[in-house]
């Protein structure tokens, strides 16, 4: 039987096409904005960007006419409806429905209008709740998902499978990357619904500004987590667009584990909070360990460059200039 998984597809031409038209969907988000910065830094001059008000990705007819008119050569799909546990529990229909609509519209129109290559970005939440650690790509669909974000996860799994199906049926070069926990400029620092790293940064900053004696953090601080600076992810995306044309999705992680306690101490140091750090052990810890196995990407020749300490310092500078100063 012939190999129709597309593993024989040519790679290495993306970096040579600096004037090719590239559509980055979701360019205002944490991930999309970093990809745009990286592409511009690398000398790409023909980026097509649309805000939500200019192009509603959930509208099939709008997406279809956009592709018919603009005819991008490459597509990076970083647009998604995202949110924390509370949002996922409150709006499950939105999390599965909106993400399925965006993916279906963009992937199908990209294929029908002759896009040369598409990169779909997912999330580490696609993996089973009790996946082996570190989590290899092969763990996908081997067990039940974490119930708190299964609606979002199922949509993302469908996106991976859609790319694979179009590759199998149409020999079309659609690839998928699965990032670990991300942080960096343009992150969400909202007090109610931000992730652990920006939430800690905001709390330490506010405690410092208010001369507070202590900051109380939920749990014991023992869970292990992995963090990747979003600029490293953007670098990996450009690398994958240029160097990877395989059937299987690719994990994109830092490979470095840190306890929540170590993370909190590091953020405290970067922010310059001199008070005490108190752990409320009556509160839950969450999953004890979550680490992606990114050895496949490393074997292709890509590794991250930004250390957690440097990344946190950059992120705090951005937070001061773009969140704190704008409130004043």
Swiss-Prot record:
Positions marked as site (Lowers pKa of active site Tyr): 156
Swiss-Prot/TrEMBL keywords: Acetylation, Isomerase, Multifunctional enzyme, NADP, Oxidoreductase
This protein's encoding gene: GER2
GO biological process, one term: 'de novo' GDP-L-fucose biosynthetic process
Record has Isomerase as a keyword: yes
Protein's UniProt keywords contain NADP: yes
Protein name: Putative GDP-L-fucose synthase 2
SUPFAM superfamilies xrefs: NAD(P)-binding Rossmann-fold domains
Protein function: Catalyzes the two-step NADP-dependent conversion of GDP-4-dehydro-6-deoxy-D-mannose to GDP-fucose, involving an epimerase and a reductase reaction.
GO MF term list: GDP-L-fucose synthase activity; isomerase activity
Organism in which the protein naturally occurs: Arabidopsis thaliana (Mouse-ear cress)
Record-annotated disulphide pairs: none
């Amino acid at each position: 039987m012939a190999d129709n998984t597309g593993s024989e597809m040519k790679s290495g031409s993306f970096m040579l096409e600096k004037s090719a038209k590239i559509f980055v969907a979701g360019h205002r988000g944490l991930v999309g904005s970093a990809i745009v910065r990286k592409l511009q830094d690398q000398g790409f001059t023909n980026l097509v960007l649309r805000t939500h008000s200019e192009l509603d990705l959930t509208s099939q007819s709008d997406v279809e006419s956009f592709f018919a008119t603009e005819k991008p050569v490459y597509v990076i799909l970083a647009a998604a409806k995202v949110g924390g546990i509370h949002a996922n529990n409150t709006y499950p229909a939105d999390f599965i429905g909106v993400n399925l609509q965006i993916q279906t519209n963009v992937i199908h129109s990209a294929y029908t209008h002759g896009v040369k290559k598409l990169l779909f970005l997912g999330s580490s939440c696609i993996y089973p709740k009790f996946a082996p650690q570190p989590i290899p790509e092969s763990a996908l669909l081997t067990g039940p998902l974490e119930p708190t974000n299964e609606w979002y996860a199922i949509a993302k799994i469908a996106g991976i499978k859609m790319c694979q199906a179009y590759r199998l049926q149409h020999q079309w070069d659609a690839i998928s990357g699965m990032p670990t926990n991300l942080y960096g400029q343009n992150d969400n620092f909202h007090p109610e619904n931000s992730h652990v790293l920006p939430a800690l940064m905001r709390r330490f900053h506010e405690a410092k500004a208010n001369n507070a004696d202590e900051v109380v953090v939920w749990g014991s601080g023992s869970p292990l987590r992995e963090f990747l600076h979003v600029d490293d992810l953007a670098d990996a995306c450009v690398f994958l667009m240029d160097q990877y044309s395989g059937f299987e999705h690719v994990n994109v992680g830092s490979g470095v584990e840190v306890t929540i306690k170590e993370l909190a101490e590091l953020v405290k140091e970067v922010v310059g909070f001199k008070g005490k750090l108190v752990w409320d052990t009556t509160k839950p810890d969450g999953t004890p360990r979550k680490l992606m196995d990114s050895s496949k990407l490393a074997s292709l020749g890509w590794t991250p460059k930004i250390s957690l300490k440097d990344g946190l310092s950059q992120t705090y500078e951005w937070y001061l200039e773009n969140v704190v100063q704008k409130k004043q």
